Every structure is written in structure tokens, then in C-alpha cells.
Design a protein with these regions (language model features):
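Non-catalytic terminal/accessory segments
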Residues: 274-275, 382-383, 481
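N-terminal transition regions in large eukaryotic proteins
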Residues: 3, 312-317, 324-343
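Amphipathic alpha-helical scaffolding segments comprising HEAT/armadillo-like alpha-solenoid repeats
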Residues: 1, 21-33, 52-64, 84-96, ...
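Amphipathic alpha-helical segments within extended alpha-helical solenoids and repeat-rich scaffolds
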Residues: 285-294, 383
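Redox- and metal-dependent alpha/beta enzyme cores, enriched for Fe-S-associated oxidoreductases
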Residues: 24, 360, 368-377, 382-394
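Structural detector for internal amphipathic alpha-helices that build alpha-solenoid repeat scaffolds
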Residues: 8-20, 30, 40-52, 61, ...
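Non-transmembrane accessory domains of multi-pass membrane transporters/channels
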Residues: 1-26, 311-318, 322
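Short inter-helical turns and helix N-cap capping residues of alpha-solenoid HEAT/ARM repeat scaffolds
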Residues: 4-5, 35-37, 67-68, 98-100, ...
Length: 499
């Protein structure tokens, strides 16, 4: 206990507490005078947590001689927890202390254990409504450490503060208090990227009580992809049956990227479909293999065509994600842990791990599923894959031009957003006037990169309505789309070069 190494002192204190040593109180009292600041703070925290009222005089003695403000602040918190008759008398004079830690210690010591203390209440209200940013930030921090829902109305005020750092701290404190009346206000701030880590922490603390509000927010039409992905992250962090049931409702969402992320997080929660529902995922799997087979054929037709290099690359990225989605679907039907391990090793550069993953699938899958899954995972050329799948998923060979036309007509609506953007870029690059309606409808796409590419392509095609569209998108919610619209507007307004 007299060691100069804090870890050794903590270890001894833990052992003494674990065995319920008869002299535990006296021994902690000795540690209160340790030379090391962090050790004194640890001792005071233990007195507070264990409510060792027989050490109240030791705490008072420490308060009277302590020079370190962090230790002094902790001493005030501890003394408040011990519930002594003179608590208000000793702590109230420090409510307006110049030092942050001392003031915080006195406030927490009083309000956490005597929430109706009038001077402390009045001072808290002054801090919450102060014109000074630092004082409001102190209030947001204090409310979390006080940890009582009786003060939630103050947190509600701070959640609407113009300073994001204060809102961030208020969200963190709300997660500690867990007043359900604050959930709506917190979830409404998901679109603010800077607040998302604090929101995730708070919602994880709320647990299942936050899921209904998160579900409503997810279904709101104004939320963009990144915000929906963040809600999925939160649901995964909360975990449990209710979170899984909520994620399962999103498996048919229109966005291919979000759908893949839903599957990924369900897999990490080790979701297993009920026997009566497995056919749903088998059907999804067959649909996915159908698209993958089409992608293989399309990439084969565009391979080596320099004009379509960007589109070919986008199809390759989409192929990788859809192949991964196929493995995630299998994990819902067969043992999840085994399938996630297999998924991790299927593309391993270590031959033994890859071979083992394929053997697991060969032993696990039914014959029907083997026929459509293994050709997409084994070491085969594209032509060999297509040959093995041609009975179930026949594909025809097309010229690059005809394949791209088919892609626009049949794949655009189900494609990942980067693939859509590359296809629109190709239309502008090729001066292709046959898909003006697609370009116009793509200006309403939820993805900024798709909207800005549609604007660029329409500009390249000199569509008659381009100026009207540019005027609209100068006020687009996305800064990148606004910038593209402004640049294109200036380009169209510039006089033609006489040379």
C-alpha cells in the first residue's frame, strides 16, 4: 500500500476489498495520505463507492490540507456521498470556486446526494443559462456526473445549444442519466456527423429503450445513406433480440449498399433464421447469384475496352460486395460462427486457409446450393464459372456497346451508387442522348456523387433544361453538388471562345 507504483497499490486494494478484509476501512484511510495524486483520488473514490462513513473525518482532514485541485474536487464528491450533517456547510462555499475541478466536486457532492439543495440548484441553473460557453460546458458535464433524471430539463436545454461541443457533452451526459424523454432529441441529431460518436455511446447506454426511436429515424425519408448506416451501427452496438428483429425489417431496403451493411451487421450479431424463414434467404441467395453471374458476363464483354475501363472497374467493386453478401446470406442459414470464419478465409493468400474454407462450404452446403455457390468461389476463370452456371443462369455474349445499353436498361436500378455514377459518366463521355430521362431522374438520387455526375453529363450533352437544373442544384444539400453546379453554371455563362 506504500508502493510508489500506483498499479501495485490498486492491486492491493482490490485484493483487500475482494476478501472483505476486516481492516479495509483503516487501510484505505492510510492510502488517503499517499504521496501520489492518482492514488489519493483512487482511495477517495473507493470511500465514496463503499460509503465508508467511518472515514468522514479522514476525508475532512484531506479537504483541509489538500493542495491538488483534482484530489480536492474528488474529496468534495466523496464527502457528499457520505451524507454527513454538515455537508452543505462544508461544500456550499465552493460552488463558485474559480477552479473547474473544485467547483465540479462541490456541485456533484451536493446535488447527487441532496438534489434539493437550493444554492446548488440555483448555481446549476446559472451555469446552464450562462452566456459563457465554458460555463455551459461545465453544466453539461456536471449533469452527467450528478446522474439524476430530476435535472433532465436542463439537459434538454443544453441539447439545443448552438455550440456543438456543449451538445456533444450533453448527449454523453444523457446517456448516463438515461431519461427516455431525451431520446427523440438525441436521435434527431444523427445527421450532425460530429455528434455521431457521442450519440452511439448514449444510445448504447439506453439500450433497447432507444430502438423504437432509432427505427422511426431510420425510416425517415430525409436521412441519407451515411446516417442510416450510423443507425445500423448503433443497433448492432445495442444488440439483443429486439435489435436483430429491427435489422431484419431492413433486409429488403432499396439501397444496395445499405442492404449489404444490414446483412453484415446481422451476421456479426450471429443472426440465425428460423427454420420456417430460411427459404427467404435461400431465395435472396439465388437472386444474388443471378446478379453476380450477370456481372461476370458484363465484365467479360467490357474487358480490355479502354473506353469502358471506369465502368468495368465499378462492376468489379460491386461484384466483390455482392459476393460477400452471398456469404453473409449463407451465414443466416448455416452456423453463423463457422460461416464468418469461412468468410474471413475464403480470399486468404494462404493457400491452406483458402482450401479449408472451401472444404467447409463443400461439407456444409446442400447439393443445390453447392452448384451455384462454389463456382463463384473456387479458383476458376470467368468462362469456366459461366459455363458451370449456364443451366441455372444463362448469359449471352454481347458487344461492349450492346452490353452497356443493357446495363443502363436492366442494371442501373439495382446497381451500387458508384456503379450508377460511372454509368452516368459514360453517358456524358459518349455524348449519348438516348437516356436523357435517366439523367434527369438521377438528379433526385440520394447519393451526391450520382447527382453531380448527372449534372456533368447533362452539361456535356448540352441538354436544353441544363440551366434550370443547375439553378436548382446550386442550393443542393450537398456541398460537392453545389460546387459542381456553380462551376457548370459559370462555364455555360462564359462567352464562347472565338478562336
Amino acid at each position: 500500500l506504500n508502493s510508489q507504483y500506483p498499479a501495485e497499490v490498486y492491486y492491493c486494494l482490490n485484493l483487500l476489498e475482494e476478501v472483505d478484509h476486516p481492516d479495509l476501512s483503516d487501510l484505505i484511510g492510510q492510502v488517503l495520505s499517499n504521496d501520489i495524486v492518482v492514488v489519493r483520488i483512487e482511495a477517495l473514490q473507493r470511500v465514496r463507492r463503499l460509503k465508508l462513513t467511518d472515514l468522514a473525518d479522514h476525508v475532512v482532514a484531506r479537504m483541509e490540507i489538500e493542495a491538488d485541485t483534482k484530489v480536492l474536487g474528488q474529496a468534495y464528491k466523496t464527502y457528499g456521498a457520505l451524507g454527513q450533517a454538515d455537508t452543505a456547510e462544508r461544500l456550499e462555499p465552493n460552488l463558485s470556486a474559480d477552479d473547474y475541478d473544485v467547483q465540479k466536486g462541490a456541485m456533484v457532492g451536493l446535488l447527487r446526494h441532496a438534489p434539493h439543495n437550493k444554492p446548488a440548484q440555483d448555481h446549476l441553473m446559472e451555469l446552464v443559462r450562462s452566456g459563457e460557453v465554458e460555463e455551459r460546458r461545465l453544466a453539461a458535464d456536471l449533469l452527467g456526473e450528478i446522474g439524476l433524471s430530476v435535472f433532465s430539463e436542463y439537459l434538454a436545454e443544453l441539447l439545443e445549444d448552438p455550440d456543438l461541443l456543449i451538445v456533444d457533452q450533453a448527449i454523453t451526459s444523457a446517456g448516463i442519466i438515461q431519461d427516455p424523454d431525451l431520446i427523440d432529441s438525441i436521435v434527431a441529431k444523427i445527421p450532425v456527423a460530429a455528434l455521431q460518436p457521442a450519440i452511439k455511446y448514449a444510445m448504447h447506454s439506453y439500450g433497447e429503450s432507444a430502438i423504437e426511436t432509432l427505427d422511426r429515424a431510420f425510416c425517415a425519408p430525409h436521412l441519407i445513406r451515411q446516417e442510416k448506416l450510423h443507425i445500423i451501427d448503433i443497433l448492432r452496438a445495442i444488440g439483443g433480440t429486439k435489435a436483430i428483429e429491427t435489422l431484419c425489417r431492413y433486409i429488403d431496403i432499396e439501397s444496395a449498399e445499405i442492404r449489404h451493411y444490414v446483412f453484415l451487421n446481422l451476421a456479426h450479431l450471429h443472426y440465425q433464421a428460423d427454420p420456417d424463414d430460411r427459404y427467404i434467404y435461400v431465395n435472396h441467395l439465388i437472386e444474388e447469384v443471378d446478379v453476380i453471374t450477370w456481372l461476370l458476363a458484363a465484365m467479360g464483354d467490357l474487358y480490355g475496352q479502354a473506353d469502358y475501363a471506369l465502368v468495368h472497374s465499378a462492376l468489379g467493386s460491386e461484384l466483390d460486395l455482392r459476393r460477400d453478401k452471398m456469404l453473409l446470406l449463407i451465414s443466416f442459414i448455416f452456423p453463423s460462427i463457422i460461416m464468418l470464419d469461412t468468410r474471413a478465409h475464403i480470399d486468404s493468400k494462404v493457400a491452406e486457409l483458402r482450401t479449408f474454407a472451401l472444404e467447409v462450404l463443400d461439407n456444409l452446403l446442400s447439393n443445390e446450393l453447392k452448384e451455384i455457390v462454389l463456382p463463384l468461389l473456387d479458383d476458376l476463370r470467368v468462362t469456366e464459372r459461366l459455363h458451370l452456371l449456364k443451366v441455372r443462369f444463362p448469359q449471352q455474349r454481347l458487344s461492349s456497346l450492346n452490353r452497356f445499353e443493357e446495363m443502363i436498361n436492366s442494371h442501373y436500378g439495382r446497381a451500387f451508387y458508384w456503379t450508377r455514377a460511372c454509368m452516368l459518366h459514360q453517358l456524358g463521355k459518349d455524348q449519348n442522348h438516348h437516356h436523357s430521362s435517366l439523367l434527369a431522374s438521377s438528379l433526385q438520387d440520394g447519393e451526391p456523387v450520382v447527382r453531380e455526375t448527372a449534372l456533368w453529363s447533362m452539361s456535356e450533352l448540352n441538354e436544353e433544361e441544363i440551366n434550370d437544373y443547375l439553378d436548382i442544384h446550386i442550393n443542393d444539400p450537398s456541398a460537392t453538388v453545389r460546387a459542381v453546379a456553380r462551376d457548370l453554371k459559370e462555364k455555360h455563362a462564359a462567352p464562347p471562345n472565338s478562336s
